[in-house]
Amino acid sequence: MGADAAIGQIKDAKKRYAAGVLKYAQMGYWDGDYQPKDTDILALFRVTPQDGVDPVEAAAAVAGESSTATWTVVWTDRLTAADMYRAKAYKVEPVPGQPGQYFCWVAYELDLFEEGSIANLTASIIGNVFSFKPLKACRLEDMRLPVAYVKTFRGPPTGIVVERERLDKFGRPLLGATTKPKLGLSGKNYGRVVYEGLKGGLDFVKDDENINSQPFMHWRDRFLYCMEAVNKAQAETGEVKGHYLNITAGTMEEMYRRADFAKELGSVVVMVDLIVGWTAIQSISNWCRENDMLLHMHRAGHGTYTRQKGHGISFRVIAKWLRLAGVDHLHTGTAVGKLEGDPMTVQGYYNVCREDVTRTDYTRGIFFDQDWAGLRKVMPVASGGIHAGQMHQLIDLFGEDVVLQFGGGTIGHPDGIQAGAIANRVALETMILARNEGRDIKNEGPEILVEAAKWCQPLRAALDTWGEVTFNYASTDTSDFVPTASVA
C-alpha cells in the first residue's frame, strides 16, 4: 500500500536537511521498494492512525521514532550514516476485519542494537512510539530476529532436553501445582502443602508470583520448609522432585542472596517474575547457567500490555524475548483454563518456545520465519484454572513438552492435597497410555477418564467435583486471519 510517490521521499539533500519540519516519509523512514536483508531486525506493528493521518505516514512515524528520528530536521544527521541507520517502513496493509487498523512492517539495521541486550532492544522498539500522538493505538505483533543477533544471546540455561535428563522423566508432560492460598500460610504449613503434592505424584510445586518475604512467612523459612518437603518426597517416591523457589526481591543483591541459599539447600530450580525486568532476568539466567539451576519464569503483569488486541505487545513477542534472555520454563497459557488464551494463538506461543525454526503461520499469529540458531528450547507451562477433567484437551493441544500445573485442581480436591495430586497423575498417565495405543484422545478423552476413574477414587472425586467446569469465554486476542472458537 502506498509508494514513495504517495507522500514523496525527498532525495535532494539541501531540501532534506533544511531546517524545519518534514513528514517522516519525506525524511526517508518509508521505502516501499525496500527488500529486507537477512541481517535486519524486522518488526510488525498494528497501528490505528488518528483521523486524517495517512497510514503510510503513520508507519514511517513508527519507523522514525523507534530508530533515529525526532519531530524536526536536525543537521547532525549528516554526521552519521543516516541512510543506513534509519529504520525503514516498507509495507502497509489493512488489518482484515478491523477498519481503521493497519499492519506495518519495519526493518531495522542490526547496528542500531547492542548485542545480547533485551533492555536495549526494547528501549528502541517500544521505548517511544506507543505514546505518539498521531496514533490512536499501536501494538507490536511480531518480530524477526536475525541469526546474527540471536547468536549474541545465551538463551535458556538448561533447556528441555537437559531438564528431562536431569529429572529422568520422558514421554509425558511434567506435572505441577501452585501452592494455595498463595498468601497467608506459615512456613511449616506451606511446606506441608508442598510435601503432600509431591508425594501424590507431582513433579514440581511452585511459589506464586506474589509470595516473596512477608510478615506471615519469611523467605528463608519458606525455602527451608519447602526443601525439607522436596527431600522427603524424593526419598519416599524415588523420583526427582522440585519446588520453584521464588527469589523475586527488591534488589539484585537480594535476589542473588536468595538464589545462593536455594542452591545451598539443594534446589534444582529457582523462579522469578517477569516484572523484575529484562536486565534482572538476563542476570539471573547467567547465574542459573553457572550454577546448573533451572529458571522458572512467571509472567506476572504481562496482561497489562499483551491482552488488548489494539494496543500493547503480543505475548508471542514477549516469548521470543524471554527465549533470548534465557528462561527454562515460561507460563504460556492453557486455552482451556481461566486466563485469556485463544487456542490457535496460544499454540503459536508454544511454537515460539519449542521449535528450532518457528515457521510463518498466520492462523497462529506468527508473521515471520524465526531461526533460533541452535538456542535451547523453553518448556512452556500451562497454568490457571485447569483440572484433571481437561487432561485430554491439554495433551491434544500442547503435546508432551509442557508443564501442566494444577493449583486449585490439586489443592482444592475434596479428599485432600495428596489425593488431588494422585488424580492428576493418574489422569495424565492414563491419557498418555491411550495416546500411545493410538486412541483418539481428543474425542474419546472423557470416556477414557471415566473408565480410569473406576479404579481410582481420587480421580473419580476430581471428575465429580470439576468435570463440568469450563471457562468458555470469547478470547480478546485472536488471529486476524482465521476465526477460532474456544475448545472448552
Swiss-Prot record:
Disulfide bonds: none annotated. Keywords: Calvin cycle, Carbon dioxide fixation, Lyase, Magnesium, Metal-binding, Monooxygenase, Oxidoreductase. Substrate binds at residues 128, 178, 182, 299, 331, 383. Pfam families: RuBisCO_large, RuBisCO_large_N. InterPro entries: RuBisCO (IPR033966), RuBisCo_large_chain_AS (IPR020878), RuBisCO_lsu_C (IPR000685), RuBisCO_lsu_C_sf (IPR036376), RuBisCO_lsu_fd_N (IPR017443), RuBisCO_lsu_N_sf (IPR036422), RuBisCO_lsuI (IPR020888). Belongs to the RuBisCO large chain family. Type I subfamily. RuBisCO catalyzes two reactions: the carboxylation of D-ribulose 1,5-bisphosphate, the primary event in carbon dioxide fixation, as well as the oxidative fragmentation of the pentose substrate. Both reactions occur simultaneously and in competition at the same active site. Heterohexadecamer of 8 large chains and 8 small chains. This is Ribulose bisphosphate carboxylase large chain. The gene is cbbL.
